[in-house]
Amino acid sequence: MADEELVKKMVRAVLQSSKSGLSLSDLQVEYKDLTGELIPYKQLGYVTLDALLHSMPSIVKLDKGQSGEVMCHATTGNEMAHITKLAARQRTAKKTGRPQVVNCQMRVKPAAPLVLNAKPRTSLRQPDHRGRLGRGGGRGHGDTRTGCMRDPQLDGKGGRPHNTPPNTPSRKPSLPSERPEKRMTLPSRFQKEVHAHILRNPQHINVPSNLNENTTPPKPRLPHSAPYSPKLVQSRLQEVLNKHSNGLWVSKLPQLYREHYKQDLPSEALKELENWTHICTVEKPCSSKPQELLLYPAKETSQITPTPTHDRSPSHHKKPQTQRPSLTAKSNTPESPKALSPDLKQKLGELLLKYSSGLWAHALPKLYQDTYKCKLPEFVLDQLTLLSDICTIDYPVPDNPKRAILYAKVVEDENRNQSGLAGQEMKLERRLSSQTVPPLVIPRVEYPSVLVVDASDTNCVILRYIGEGYSKAQEKLEDEMREFYRQDNTKMALRSPSPGQLTAVGAEEEDDIIRAQVCEVMADKVKVYYVDHGFSEVISIRKLFELNEKFYRLPFQATKCKLAGLESFSQEQAVLKKLESIATGKILLAEILEREDMPLVVLYDTSQDDDVNINAACMKALQDRSLESPLKVNSAYMNVSVTSVCSDGTIYCQVPSRGLTKLNEILEKTENYFHSQVTSESLVSRPFCGKNCLARYKGKWSRVEITNLHGSRVLDILFVDVGVQASVEVIELREIPPPLLRDLISTPAQALKCCLAGLPVSVGLWTPDAVQWLRDTVLHISDCSLKIAKVDETKRLAHVYLFTSKNFHDTSCSLNQQLADSDLWNHQKDVFLSSRGPLKSLNVPTATQTSSLKTDRGDKALHTPKKTSPPLGSKSTPAGSPPERLSLPPALELPEIGQNMDVFVSVACHPGHFVLQPWQDMYKLVVLMGEMILHYNKMEEKALKVEKNQVCAAKVENNWYRVLVKGVLTNGLVSVFQLDYGKHELVSGTKLRPLTQEFCQLPFQAITAQLAGLKPRQWSEEASIVFRNHVEKKPLVAQLESVQEASQPWERKVMIYLVDTSQEERDIWLHDIMAEFTDEMTKTA
């Protein structure tokens, strides 16, 4: 079964790669190179390919070429923008009439591929068992629940609220409990759901739908060469454990056994491991999966320090995941203490509390020494069980038990919380004259839309949430109020208002009635606060009416928030003026960092071509423009330092100026401050995009701005004063010292962005050799000279002539001219360079690896360098050969047929094709992706010969993924399949890197699935939308029906039942919903 939307996307990709157009035959060839098959026009119901293309006017434009042959061209237009129009009513403090409609084209910030800062709860609530008759053919319905079930919101880790995934609410249809009582008007309900989906999400999921492809038969299991012999297995097990004296995972034992002895490990042996105490010791370090046990040689038990019983028997402990035996026990371990000192425990607890999303154990020694100026005792890492009372310990890397993550235990004072809540309720009742209104609940979506009403203080910004349940509910309420008070309202007039009383207020110019609260009572006037619109006004007392009780049900819509990063400058006029001009009265997106009574947020304006970080823009308003680097045409500067050279020819320089002198003085004070402080207060515990902080660059503290977050532990930063990008762990960042905060914020960035005059700045026009030569020539030279030829104010880009001597009067001696005249500038065919330079490691120089090119200091003739890394596509490139053959990870372990597993649906095309991920192991994938980002973003661009069916790493947007190459286009684009998410992407060939064995330990997480309980059919787009709305991006429970094995993990397919157990009162079986939808559509057809 062909998916027409997938075909359209592939056709568009092929056509966009050819500017001159393609003939029908060439289109078929290019399409097959990309997808592995011809365009399936017959399967889509078209007699000819030409007929199919004519049905895609938004994709293909057909015309005749000079030879009379039909040519296909990509259609241009804005249909690819995929933007959503959001509308909301807006009031201003000057007018209380009928709210006007504010139209705003908003581009929703892309959500993370998964909850990167969260560890999924241990398990979801499991559904009730149902017989085959209850599920067969999709004739059953959602179960109605009356019994008490385990709360699905509980996190298996107990005290880490920040590590739970966000709730994923969905509007579920109300299903009848019995088939005969079918009173549902399904066609209209589903029609509304489909219509709403199309309006807010016009793009289609790019997933293959053909489940009828032939698959390679599964590999036969290795037979046992002899009957099961316990003694033989025990002797072999001793040999394996002797080679892994520090322990190994039980899940890895069958693979190691097979590699050593060319036989499968008998299943009976796995069941008897715990009884073979003379051979091995079995430990259970964490509870994320019951089969993840650690195995140690039995002889180690005599070397490990005797510990209390609860440490050695974690399976009987209340929190077994915190128990961990020493993996590096040595003969001197008896000298190690059995408990931490109170001072050491307090300091470690402070560090862990700073990183609520977890802290790598291996990072603890350096962080401890940097913070407290003393060395962490070695026994702490050797015996992590000593930390069990202040943190929980997890082991996300199966092949490396030493790579533990520590989570601080948060103990809540329940009595204090209850008393505080009671006090708030009493205060609310007094304020509302015994009438209560439910509190406003913060939207659960990742980036809610908000309307900024008032911004007179960054610590108290008044806003309203936009969307279902918020602005739309308010509109409905005010419509009801208008109808209600349109009757004889003289009897409803409020004669004696009192401060704090809720009331209804008639608008001045129109018939609107809105809710308000009395603030102050005067002679014949009152000052009221409009609780849904966030402003105050003095009005006549005759406009007050008694607020009927039925209008108390909706929470007050005007709420307050704090803008992150601006806490110390909340009243600065420059900040408030900027905020007023770019935020007030506009619909923005809010990223909620803290979900408190007054949430901490970052605001984004996504209505323009580029996203605008409102918080960062307000912070820049504090900068002293007189300290900026000078940009005057025809001016020459000496003692210039080139700090960065990008692959597109852009360079960053530091020019002597007052700003640079002041910056160096402040950074010197910063060094002294950190040397003298012994505290954890400077650690960055809550990073966010646009935040200004400090990180080490070449051993010294430098200013950075966070540009992107990859979860809670790995992030991208920009060294604003040198123009260098890097990927680091959050533990490497420090807050700007409070005494120096204003001075550092007010000093503009000192990296001057330049390009070489006369040479183009564009992707692909600079050869690798030209970039390398320029880096080798100018980096780390502090006395270059430059002359400004032109200034582009819009981009703040200076076109300059660059010299390595002080002879800047003669432009013929400039590096610009030398590059233009050299052979290095001759562009080689099929060379692709990224528009940005590679992200640098903080521990290496800014330049790439230095080649053998040597230039004197007098700007003499250019010498030809020795090529250190031949460009991509060079026939003589040995580095372009395929990488060493990887040992692919084992296939993902599935439960037995008929058993349940918790899953997350990452991609949903239709019931015949969707992709699952194991819910319990999602955090392991987060850890893996963070490690890949740190690894690949520090690598230089290298040639990689791309081949079909090759497994490698690919950079998609800002993340690195494990991918399978599906096809290669002639223009350098590569079609890849994400092995952990099940998505198809088109990426540049320069974004591919060899996948190292280190990243092949975790099984590929994507599981291709088909919904059981339904007859095979070709699903309509309406049915696909209904299915996606119910399952995509949601945690569900899957019951395994069958498995179609294959030779490769990504070819394996499963048939499952899906159950939504998020509602406590009933289970929703998805095949029931789809079967009922199909039945109703058949009846109405």
From Swiss-Prot:
SMART domains: TUDOR. Keywords: Cytoplasm, Differentiation, Repeat, RNA-binding, Spermatogenesis. Residues 3-76, 229-299, 340-410 form the HTH OST-type domain. The keyword Methyltransferase does not apply. GO terms for biological process: lens fiber cell differentiation; lens morphogenesis in camera-type eye; P granule organization; piRNA processing; post-transcriptional regulation of gene expression; spermatogenesis. It is found in: Cytoplasm. GO terms for cellular component: P granule; ribonucleoprotein granule. InterPro entries: LOTUS-like, OST-HTH/LOTUS_dom, SNase_OB-fold_sf, TDRD7_LOTUS_3, Tudor, Tudor_domain_containing, Tudor_TDRD7_rpt2, Tudor_TDRD7_rpt3. Residues 496-554, 686-743 form the Tudor domain. Coiled coil: none annotated. GO terms for molecular function: mRNA binding. Residues 112-183, 200-228, 297-341, 843-888 are annotated as: Disordered. The keyword Repeat applies. Pfam families: OST-HTH, TUDOR. Its main location: cytoplasm. Residues 203-216, 322-335, 843-853 have a biased composition (Polar residues). Signal peptide: none annotated. PANTHER family: FI02030P-RELATED, TUDOR DOMAIN CONTAINING PROTEIN. Component of specific cytoplasmic RNA granules involved in post-transcriptional regulation of specific genes: probably acts by binding to specific mRNAs and regulating their translation. Probably required during spermatogenesis. This is Tudor domain-containing protein 7B. It comes from Danio rerio (Zebrafish). The lineage of its organism: Eukaryota, Metazoa, Chordata, Craniata, Vertebrata. The gene is tdrd7b.
